[in-house]
Every structure is written in C-alpha cells, then in structure tokens.
From Swiss-Prot:
Protein name listed in UniProt: Major capsid protein VP4
Superkingdom of the source species: Viruses
Subcellular location: Virion
Function (record text): Self-assembles to form a helical, filamentous nucleocapsid. Together with capsid protein 2, wraps arounds the DNA and maintains it in an A-form. Capsid proteins probably maintain the DNA in A-form by non-specific desolvation and specific coordination of the DNA phosphate groups by positively charged residues. This certainly protects the viral DNA under conditions such as the extreme desiccation of its host.
Entry keyword set: Virion
One Gene Ontology cellular component annotation held by this UniProt entry: helical viral capsid
Single GO MF annotation: DNA binding
Comment field on protein domains: The N-terminus projects into a DNA groove.
Length: 137
C-alpha cells in the first residue's frame, strides 16, 4: 500500500534506499582513500622538512619556542613557494612573512639566512616541496 504522504510503496522505498546507500558507500570509500593518500603525502612532507631544517636549527643554536617558530615559518614559506604565483607576488608574500615572524620575536639577520636556506633547497612544482638534501651541505 502506498504512503499517503509520498505515494511510494514500502518495497519501492527500500529498493531506492538500498541503491542510494551503495553509491554513497562507494563515494565514501573513494573519498577516504584520497584522504589517506593526502595525509601520507603531508606526513612525508613534514618528515622531509624536519630532516632538512633540524640540522640548520641545531647548527645555529635555536631551541625551545624559537625552534617552533622557525618550523612554523618554514611551513608557511613552503606553502607560499608552492602557490602558482608570479615572482612579484611571492616577493611580497616573503616580505610579509618575514615581517610577521620578526614581530613575533625572531632575529632579522637569522630570518634572512633561514629564508635563503629554504630557497637553496631544491623545490618542485608539486603540492609539497621536495627538498634536495645534497644542496643543504
């Protein structure tokens, strides 16, 4: 007997729901796979960033909260470098980042040196910068 509100029989509603549920499950599985791959890419990115930056931070005697600030700066700067922007926009973003972290208490000369160090690490145009460890020696 069809529903008074919708006019659909119970069997039709069950059939519709079961088909809809399967497509939603497939979409969820695919989205979950993509999210896992993206999370793995991000984790690989951070491990490579740490491998490249920690020796520099150790060599310059940076520790404690300053180390966290330098790593935040590196992550933000890498995001800037990964944008598909022209040289002028990147220059301005670099100046803005430099100023932001200078206001947060980082030394101006070391900021310049740190950003130059990040620039010296070879980058690619993928979503995450891949550091070339040979260039850091």
């Amino acid at each position: 007997m069809p529903s008074r509100r919708t006019g659909i029989t119970t069997e039709d509603a069950i059939t519709k729901y079961s088909v809809k549920a399967k497509t939603e499950q497939t979409a969820y599985k695919n989205a979950t796979k993509d999210m896992v791959v993206q999370a793995q890419n991000i984790m690989n990115f951070y491990s490579v960033v740490n491998q490249a930056l920690i020796p520099w931070l150790n060599a310059h005697g940076v520790g404690g909260n300053l180390r966290i600030l330098y790593r935040q700066l590196a992550n933000e700067y890498v995001k800037v470098l990964n944008t598909k922007q022209s040289g002028e926009v990147i220059k301005r973003l670099k100046i803005a980042l430099r100023h932001k972290y200078w206001l947060r208490g980082l030394d101006e000369a070391m900021l310049d040196e740190f950003m130059d160090y990040i620039d010296s690490l070879k980058s690619t145009t993928t979503n995450y910068i891949i550091f070339n460890m040979q260039s850091s020696k």
